[in-house]
């Protein structure tokens, strides 16, 4: 199974991806996480350092694939998760989609691409071009990371549009949304009402999730010294269990941009209407009585 994780830049995709990878490994699966970001820091919390990228390795070998060995590009991370960083072209030049393609090509050459139960692509920021939508060409499922904010949900909607487009020619489905570090989910619920899709999990506003990134550790590793964090790991295990159940998934129908802008902004600008809508059923019940 291959999974592509997308979401607004800075929303916590890499932190979430690493913890999901560990959760899948804890369920007995052989997992490979592929970072698809020029920053090459996707797997930092799994390995504890910035591993060399596929592109760096290929350049050092003058792109002679036959001179590259699995141990040159695949690094062992915490919890028996294997890690690869695709890297990216120089700033302002080249195409990120090409880099993803070269990464998959090399892993196939090394007979490594099909050795794993789960391959998880952690993809940078929003989908702004066909190049960075390239991981969707290989994925069975897409997971979108968001929070309860306007910008993150707007980005989620654009990603949903990319999933729908790719699903025309690939066996791709949207597994659902994951809310990351949010104290509320009212805006998420409002969006899902307009663009129906599963919500796999909503993680509460836990500071240790952010701190784990700085420490270069997953929550599963931190819990070894802080048992009180075990309940946080259960959120990721729940996501892993849903993925392993091979959900049917959906082909989303995104909300038009202007309509979504109006929907989400109205939620903040006219909170009274929202409150009244929530109270309507109670009023009706009272009238019936």
From Swiss-Prot:
This protein's pathway: Porphyrin-containing compound metabolism; chlorophyll biosynthesis (light-independent)
Keyword Kinase appears in the UniProt entry: no
Any one GO MF annotation of this record: oxidoreductase activity, acting on iron-sulfur proteins as donors
Residues that bind ATP: 10-15, 39, 180-181
Keywords, sorted A to Z: 4Fe-4S, ATP-binding, Chlorophyll biosynthesis, Chloroplast, Iron, Iron-sulfur, Magnesium, Metal-binding, Nucleotide-binding, Oxidoreductase, Photosynthesis, Plastid
PROSITE patterns: NIFH_FRXC_1, NIFH_FRXC_2, NIFH_FRXC_3
EC number: 1.3.7.7
InterPro entries, per database record: NifH/chlL_CS (IPR030655), NifH/frxC (IPR000392), P-loop_NTPase (IPR027417), Protochlorophyllide_ATP-bd (IPR005971)
GO biological process, one term: photosynthesis, dark reaction
GO CC, any one term: chloroplast
Catalytic activity: chlorophyllide a + oxidized 2[4Fe-4S]-[ferredoxin] + 2 ADP + 2 phosphate = protochlorophyllide a + reduced 2[4Fe-4S]-[ferredoxin] + 2 ATP + 2 H2O
Location in or out of the cell: Plastid, Chloroplast
Cofactor note: Binds 1 [4Fe-4S] cluster per dimer.
Binding site for Mg(2+): 14
Keyword Iron: yes
Binding of [4Fe-4S] cluster, residues: 95, 129
Assembly: Homodimer. Protochlorophyllide reductase is composed of three subunits; ChlL, ChlN and ChlB.
NCBIfam families: DPOR_bchL
Function, as annotated: Component of the dark-operative protochlorophyllide reductase (DPOR) that uses Mg-ATP and reduced ferredoxin to reduce ring D of protochlorophyllide (Pchlide) to form chlorophyllide a (Chlide). This reaction is light-independent. The L component serves as a unique electron donor to the NB-component of the complex, and binds Mg-ATP.
HAMAP family found in the cross-reference section: ChlL_BchL
Family: Belongs to the NifH/BchL/ChlL family.
Name listed for the protein in its UniProt record: Light-independent protochlorophyllide reductase iron-sulfur ATP-binding protein
Organism taxonomic ancestry: Eukaryota, Viridiplantae, Streptophyta, Embryophyta, Marchantiophyta
């Amino acid at each position: 199974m291959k999974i592509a994780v997308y979401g607004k830049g800075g929303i916590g995709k890499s932190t979430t991806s690493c913890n999901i990878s560990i959760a899948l490994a804890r369920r007995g699966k052989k997992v490979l996480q592929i970072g698809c970001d020029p920053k090459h820091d996707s797997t930092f919390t799994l390995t504890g350092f910035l591993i060399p990228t596929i592109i760096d390795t290929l350049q050092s070998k003058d792109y002679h694939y036959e001179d590259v060995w699995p141990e040159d590009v695949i690094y062992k991370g915490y919890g028996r998760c294997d890690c690869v960083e695709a890297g990216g072209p120089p700033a302002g030049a080249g195409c990120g989609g090409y880099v993803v393609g070269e990464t998959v090509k090399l892993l196939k050459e090394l007979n490594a691409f099909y050795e794993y139960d789960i391959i998880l692509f952690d993809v940078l920021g929003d989908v702004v071009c066909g190049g960075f939508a390239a991981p969707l060409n290989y994925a069975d499922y897409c997971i979108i990371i968001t929070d309860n904010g306007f910008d993150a949900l707007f980005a989620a909607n654009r990603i949903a549009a990319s999933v729908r487009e790719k699903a025309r020619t690939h066996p791709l489905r949207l597994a659902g949304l994951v809310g990351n570090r949010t104290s509320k989910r009212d805006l998420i619920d409002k969006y899902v009402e307009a663009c129906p899709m599963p919500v796999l999990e909503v993680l509460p506003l836990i500071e240790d999730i952010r701190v784990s990134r700085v420490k270069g550790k997953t929550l599963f590793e931190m819990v070894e010294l802080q048992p009180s964090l075990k309940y946080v790991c259960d959120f990721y295990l729940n996501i892993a269990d849903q993925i392993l159940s091979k959900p049917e998934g959906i082909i989303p129908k995104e909300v038009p941009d202007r309509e979504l802008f109006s929907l989400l902004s109205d939620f903040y600008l006219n909170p009274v209407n929202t409150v009244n809508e929530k109270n309507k059923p109670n009023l009706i019940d009272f009238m019936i009585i």
